Curated annotation (Swiss-Prot):
Its job: One of the essential components for the initiation of protein synthesis. Stabilizes the binding of IF-2 and IF-3 on the 30S subunit to which N-formylmethionyl-tRNA(fMet) subsequently binds. Helps modulate mRNA selection, yielding the 30S pre-initiation complex (PIC). Upon addition of the 50S ribosomal subunit IF-1, IF-2 and IF-3 are released leaving the mature 70S translation initiation complex.
Family: Belongs to the IF-1 family.
Protein name from the UniProt record: Translation initiation factor IF-1, chloroplastic
Subcellular location: Plastid, Chloroplast
Major site of localization recorded for this protein: plastid
PROSITE patterns associated with the record: S1_IF1_TYPE
Keyword terms of this UniProt record: Chloroplast, Initiation factor, Plastid, Protein biosynthesis, RNA-binding, rRNA-binding
Organism listed in the record: Chlorokybus atmophyticus
GO molecular function: ribosome binding; rRNA binding; translation initiation factor activity
């Protein structure tokens, strides 16, 4: 798959929803519904409210995204 039309943004998890879905507040002020990518799910990386994450979104639907990375806390 080509990644030429992917939009990558950072945000903070605000709410944990059923079926591994999360509500994410992006740095630009928008809220997005996001699910976990396969690599995060396979490696059992725990994502909790308050964590900073990187999200990939498609330009066709800017209300949904995929969590690709959990940023480390300082």
């Amino acid at each position: 798959m080509e990644k030429q039309n992917i939009i990558e943004m950072e945000g903070v998890i605000t709410e944990s929803l059923p079926n591994a879905m999360f509500r994410v507040h992006l740095d630009n002020g928008f809220d997005v519904l996001a699910h976990i990518s396969g690599k995060i799910r396979r490696n059992y990386i725990r994502i909790l409210p308050g964590d900073r994450v990187k999200i990939e979104m498609t330009p066709y639907d800017l209300t949904k995204g995929r969590i690709t990375y959990r940023l480390r806390k300082r």
